[in-house]
Swiss-Prot record:
GO terms for biological process: neuron-neuron synaptic transmission; neuropeptide signaling pathway; sensory perception of pain. It is found in: Secreted. Belongs to the opioid neuropeptide precursor family. Residues 1-19 form the signal peptide. This is Prepronociceptin. The keyword Oxidoreductase does not apply. InterPro entries: Nociceptin (IPR002367), Opioid_neupept (IPR006024). Specific enzymatic cleavages at paired basic residues probably yield other active peptides besides nociceptin. The N-terminal domain contains 6 conserved cysteines thought to be involved in disulfide bonding and/or processing. Keywords: Cleavage on pair of basic residues, Disulfide bond, Neuropeptide, Neurotransmitter, Opioid peptide, Repeat, Secreted, Signal. Sequence repeats lie at residues 109-114, 115-120, 121-126. GO terms for cellular component: extracellular region; synaptic membrane.
Length: 187
């Protein structure tokens, strides 16, 4: 069992060493000299192997590799800085939670070769269904909070009116006692 595990480990290491994507990404990283946090080697390798879409980082690397000089032209730093920014996983999770962004991501994933606006090819019926769903959620949520708010307001009014009634009754009783005591001459 140990021999089999060692063989698999050795083969995986050899395949990663002899593949061109890691070597190309390392070369690209050396030629670009980016900030340590801006260049993600794993992302570059995945983009090279075409497992991740879109591939802005790998596009810049192919241009650098094709130039061969290792120096970028003065117009390229903007392209490099835009390509080196990769959204974090937490940012992507937050974006995917939003329904509109999720639909745009799904459209983009469905048509990887399309450069047109992502929402332009979507079916109009899908947007209508999504809007109806959002309105229903808004109505339900708004109605729920509205009902609680009005119920709370009514309960506060009832509580206050009950308090006022008790206060008035007690004050009337005490004033009657005073009058009675005053009339009897006990005061």
């Amino acid at each position: 069992m140990k021999i089999l595990f060692c063989d698999v480990l050795l083969l995986s290491l050899l395949s990663s060493v002899f593949s061109s994507c890691p070597r190309d990404c390392l070369t690209c990283q050396e030629k670009l000299h980016p900030a340590p946090d801006s260049f993600n080697l794993k992302t570059c390798i995945l983009q090279c192997e075409e497992k991740v879409f879109p591939r802005p980082l790998w596009t810049v690397c192919t241009k650098v590799m094709a130039s061969g000089s290792g120096q970028l032209s003065p117009a390229d730093p903007e392209l490099v800085s835009a390509a080196l920014y990769q959204p974090k996983a937490s940012e992507m999770q937050h974006l995917k939670r939003m329904p509109r962004v999720r639909s745009l991501v799904q459209v983009r994933d469905a048509e990887p070769g399309a450069d047109a606006e992502p929402g332009a090819d979507a079916e109009p019926g899908a947007d209508d269904a999504e809007e109806v769903e959002q309105k229903q959620l808004q109505k339900r949520f708004g109605g729920f909070t509205g009902a609680r708010k009005s119920a709370r307001k009514l309960a506060n009014q009832k509580r206050f009116s009950e308090f006022m009634r008790q206060y008035l009754v007690l004050s009337m009783q005490s004033s009657q006692r005073r009058r009675t005591l005053h009339q009897n001459g006990n005061v």
